[in-house]
């Protein structure tokens, strides 16, 4: 089975969630057998994900049955979900039971608070190596997906578990969504180690969050930069968390101030702080900074994970060997995915990346071979650690209101430019609803005209 789950102690807990759900490794094995008897292989399944044991169990069983899952936020905007369904024609949904009435599908299997439903669509033709689909936009519901092949999830889980030194005694705190590549990686690397995943739906500001992780004696935490900003506001350094031994950060660039603060805290308290870096296209993590170097190498993403290789190239594609010279960051490894899909026909495509991924990030390497991200070449932001496409956001706003729109920003805020003052509040509300992110992450500005080049393309430099 996936992650050799059938070899784990059957009574050991694979996952516990903050709503009272519990899942043992033995129950995971049994669900796999039940699902295999109920469902043909190579079906396309939309998994509407929540941080609950039923959601996790279904994904593992479906993956092990060689069905292809697309992981989606269960709270996704219905219009965006319908768009994805019309594009890819899933034959099944794995979804919370309380959402069944919204769709009218036929339920063929119930497990805990989740159900497997038949949509009535025939499974599309798919490449035999296609194992998993994940969204690239993270939040905007773009039909552009990342195509994973068999071995991607398994290799990354194994190598991350090795890099972090996970053992069956770990109790990993997971408040990141499982449909987010980093959240899924944290789950999978713990299952690989035979450890326990603590699934948290409550956010860091909720007292229930802290009550749960204290009761369950959580041993490690993974967060995006915004998570660490909240921890700092909550006076985390004064908290009594004796069981917490490891903290990891990824999903965006942490400020140097917070990086140093948490690295120094870990060093002083005998804990470990891991800075990591990854992308959906590399099945999450591709680099990590050894915790013993964290206090000395502020802002570094470290080196490649086991079995991976990182290097820089210049604008002509030539490899850069000298330290402190900027270039595009390139990664090679068994966790590099197959490529993208934007249509149902793309699901039949083979491996287009061939084990090499051009990240689109500008980086530099120091004398010790540790890498530092300098900036991005692509037009996307990471808000709360979730990738948001500026181009897709522009399309959503322009199409909804039939207006001109331009989006820019950085990882702290998206800046939206329109030409109608009366729509400012409505635009902010719309993009907040479509992305599922709080409205304070969006700034809407009214300008006289959207600046453009002679070619008609938007001149973003005039907006920044």
Give the label of every model feature segment.
Residues 11-39, 82, 148-151:
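Conserved AMP-binding/adenylate-forming core of the ANL superfamily
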Residues 34-75, 175-177, 387:
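Conserved AMP-binding/adenylate-forming
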Residues 154-171, 179-220, 305:
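Conserved AMP-binding/adenylation subdomain of ANL enzymes
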Residues 218-223, 232-296, 309:
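Gly/Ser/Thr-rich phosphate-binding loop
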């Amino acid at each position: 089975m996936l992650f050799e789950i059938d070899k784990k102690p059957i009574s050991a807990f694979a996952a516990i969630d903050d709503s009272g759900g519990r899942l043992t490794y033995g129950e995971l094995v049994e669900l796999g057998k039940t699902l295999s008897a109920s469902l043909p292989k190579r079906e396309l399944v939309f998994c509407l994900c929540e941080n609950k044991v039923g959601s996790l169990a279904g994904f593992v069983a479906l993956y092990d049955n060689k069905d292809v899952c697309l992981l989606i936020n269960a709270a996704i905007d219905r219009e965006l979900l319908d768009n994805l369904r019309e594009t890819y024609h899933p034959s099944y949904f794995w979804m919370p039971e309380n959402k069944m009435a919204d769709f009218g599908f036929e339920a063929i299997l119930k497990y805990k608070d989740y159900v497997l439903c038949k949509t009535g669509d025939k499974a599309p033709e798919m490449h035999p190596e296609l194992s998993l689909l994940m969204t690239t936009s993270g939040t905007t519901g773009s039909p552009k997906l990342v195509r994973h092949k068999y071995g991607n999830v398994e290799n990354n889980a194994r190598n991350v578990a090795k890099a972090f030194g996970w053992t069956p005694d770990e109790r990993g705190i997971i408040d990141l969504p499982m449909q987010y590549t980093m959240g899924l990686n944290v789950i999978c690397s713990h299952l690989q180690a035979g450890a326990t995943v603590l699934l948290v739906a409550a956010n860091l500001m909720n007292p229930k969050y802290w009550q749960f992780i204290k009761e369950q004696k959580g041993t490690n935490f993974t967060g995006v930069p915004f998570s660490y900003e909240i921890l700092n506001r909550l006076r985390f350094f004064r908290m009594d968390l004796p069981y917490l031994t490891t903290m990891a950060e990824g999903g965006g660039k942490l400020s140097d101030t917070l990086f140093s603060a948490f690295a120094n805290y870990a060093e002083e308290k005998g804990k470990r702080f891991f800075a990591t870096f990854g992308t959906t296209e590399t099945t999450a993590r591709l680099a990590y900074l050894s915790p013993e170097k964290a206090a000395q190498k502020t802002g570094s993403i470290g080196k490649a994970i086991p079995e991976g290789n990182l290097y820089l190239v210049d604008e002509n594609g030539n490899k850069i060997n000298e330290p402190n010279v900027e270039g595009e960051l390139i990664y090679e490894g068994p966790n590099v995915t197959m490529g993208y899909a934007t249509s149902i026909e793309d699901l039949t495509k083979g491996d287009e990346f061939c084990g090499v991924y051009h990240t689109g990030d500008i980086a530099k390497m120091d004398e010790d071979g540790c890498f530092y991200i300098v900036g991005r070449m692509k037009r996307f932001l990471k808000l709360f650690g979730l990738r948001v496409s500026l181009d897709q956001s522009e399309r959503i706003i322009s199409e909804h209101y039939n207006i001109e729109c331009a989006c820019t920003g950085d990882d702290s805020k998206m800046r939206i430019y329109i030409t109608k003052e009366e729509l400012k509040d409505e635009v902010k509300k719309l993009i907040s609803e479509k992305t599922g992110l709080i409205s304070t992450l969006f700034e809407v500005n009214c300008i006289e005209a959207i600046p453009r080049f002679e070619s008609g393309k938007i001149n973003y430099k005039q907006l920044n």
